[in-house]
Curated annotation (Swiss-Prot):
Keywords: mRNA processing, mRNA splicing, Nucleus, Spliceosome. Signal peptide: none annotated. One of its GO terms (molecular function) is RNA binding. Residues 44-82 have a biased composition (Polar residues). It is found in: Nucleus. It comes from the Eukaryota. Residues 1-83 are annotated as: Disordered. Belongs to the CWC15 family. GO terms for biological process: mRNA cis splicing, via spliceosome; mRNA splicing, via spliceosome. This is Pre-mRNA-splicing factor CWC15. Involved in pre-mRNA splicing. It comes from Candida glabrata (strain ATCC 2001 / BCRC 20586 / JCM 3761 / NBRC 0622 / NRRL Y-65 / CBS 138) (Yeast). Associated with the spliceosome. The gene is CWC15.
């Protein structure tokens, strides 16, 4: 690497002894790691275990079987099925509508389908016996 690639950290005109600031501060002169990384505790203390288990037990009791607001028991599987069925029917209708929209935007109605198909001439075959010209020649002159 040549000197052109390096930052100018000193004044140019021979003022090396007089420490003239240039206003540039290169990233290599700055400290890289300024914060210490603290370790996470591996083993919980007994007080932390008790507080976490207390918080968990409160959550478990609320979701165990009764709704707090109404005092009624949770829904059984058959009741849940009855509630889900209308939602599934609506989802199926939405899917059908999406398919119809996709059908309306098909490639059949674009300019590509309106173009006439051009019959391309046969490609060159490297084998002279199989080529179309050779077959026509044999039909005309050799019988």
């Amino acid at each position: 690497m040549t000197t052109a690639h390096r930052p100018q950290l000193e004044a140019r005109n021979g003022a090396k002894g007089a420490l003239v600031p240039t206003g540039t501060e290169h990233a290599r002169l700055l400290p890289g790691h300024t914060e210490l990384k603290a370790r996470k505790p591996k083993n919980k203390t007994t007080s932390q275990i008790q507080t976490s288990s207390d918080a968990g037990s409160v959550d478990d009791s609320t979701s165990a079987g009764t709704n707090i607001g109404t005092g009624s028991a949770t829904l059984g599987p058959s009741q849940v099925q009855k509630m889900i069925q209308p939602l599934e029917v609506e989802d199926k209708k939405d899917i059908k509508l999406v398919k119809k929209e996709d059908d309306s935007v098909s490639w059949g109605k674009t300019a590509f389908s309106r173009r006439k198909k051009v019959v391309k001439p046969e490609k060159f075959t490297n084998d002279t016996v199989r080529s179309q010209k050779h077959k026509e020649f044999l039909n005309r002159f050799v019988k």
